[in-house]
Amino acid sequence: MVVGDISTGTDVAVVGAGPGGYVAAIRAGQLGLDVTLVEKDAYGGTCLNYGCIPSKAMITASGVAHEAGHAEEMGVYADPDVDVAEMVDWKDGVVDQLTGGVEKLCKANGVNLIEGRAEFAGSDKLRVVHGGDGQGSETIEYEHAIVSTGSRPIEVPGFDFGDDPVLDSRQALAMAELPSSMVIVGGGYIGMELSTVFAKLGVDVTVVEMLDGILPQYGDDIARPVRQRAEELGIDFHFGLAADSWTDTDDGIVVTAADEDGEETEFETEKVLVAVGRQPVTDTLNLDAVGLEPNDDGRLETDHEARTDVENVFAIGDVAPGPMLAHKASKEGEVAAEVIAGEPAALDYQAVPAAVFTDPEIGTVGLTEDDAAAQGFDPVVGTFPFNASGRALTTGHDDGFVEVVADEESGFLLGAQIVGPEASELVAELGLAIEMGATLEDVASTIHTHPTLSEATMEAAEHALGHAVHTLNR
């Protein structure tokens, strides 16, 4: 049965309930606006349901299993029995708790929740289609719209996610049974995080990367400890190869990859995970109806208020320019809601942190030394290795370092690069320092608890000033 169209009105229509959209909706509700949030899949979006949260749960669980079986140096001998199905159930429980919380918070802040796929139907209208079997549609008239439809995995020609042995990250994280072997196409952050998970769970992992190294957005000094650790876990790397096809065999599949000269290499495996990046979802929105056109990357250009070229339409998260980061999306959602409500708000990207949950972890914020020099600063750099940290040594994880970058003349902190234990947590202190306009002296003179990993940030600042105590000065 087809249900006729229903028409409703709202101050703010938010399309997509990921970490950008639901935060925007909640903030707008807090500010007294009438808000409608439309989601076609699950509240919390890719991040909470299929990406950030489930991957970190599996990273933690696989890490516990691996640590338990590899602690002989500490006098601990164990052979843990891993039930992957129970591990996945635990991961799903974490996801359910968080997504349920999002839905409750939205309702508590007066947000009207609508399930369906939204597209623009004019300069002030959205059409929402419910379900895919003629369950009807409705029209939402809005004063302002916020586009937060996120991103989806990029498919590689020849590797259709609908084919059984070919996985995207969402499918890989849902496997209740592990394959004996896996080829991972892509050595970026998704490929490296998941290669670590599966290697620690005993899967024979091969990473095929088109470029000449892993984690191409980071320098070799940051990527090197991650690659070394991955190789210790048994991960096999092949660089300069582009995967182009796969074929069935009696024992699994064969993945074929070619170098720039066309010379082919074959890899026998049971599964292949394609993790070459993500692309913004803007092609389903009927943007012509509202007068918007995505840029060459498929994103919507925005200003410092997250506003697009159309005055009453905002874009946040993966569909807006900049790195695809959940916390960036959330902040953009807050700013968009506040601007719509008439509050003074603007975006500032100088101190947006990023993290990669590999082993060891990576945490970065602000400018690198090269970035700082390119922007006209005279950068001074300080570093502190974790193998000189008492706390790092007591955890058994002492790979990596903290590096801080500052302007030599003023002393203002400009950026930080961390690779090592808990880098994702440690980088927050340095992000706050940059946001507040702190100097090297401010960081160095702040007393840090001993023994902690956070002392490394203080020591790195002291090193940049030339008076480090626990490492040699420049």
Swiss-Prot record:
Q: Which residues bind FAD?
A: 39-47, 56, 118, 318, 326
Look up the record and name the cofactor or cofactors this protein needs. FAD
The entry's active site is 450
Record bears the keyword NAD: yes
* GO BP annotation list: 2-oxoglutarate metabolic process; pyruvate metabolic process
Cysteines joined through disulfide linkages: 47-52
**Subunit comment for this entry?**
Homodimer.
Q: What is this protein called?
A: Dihydrolipoyl dehydrogenase
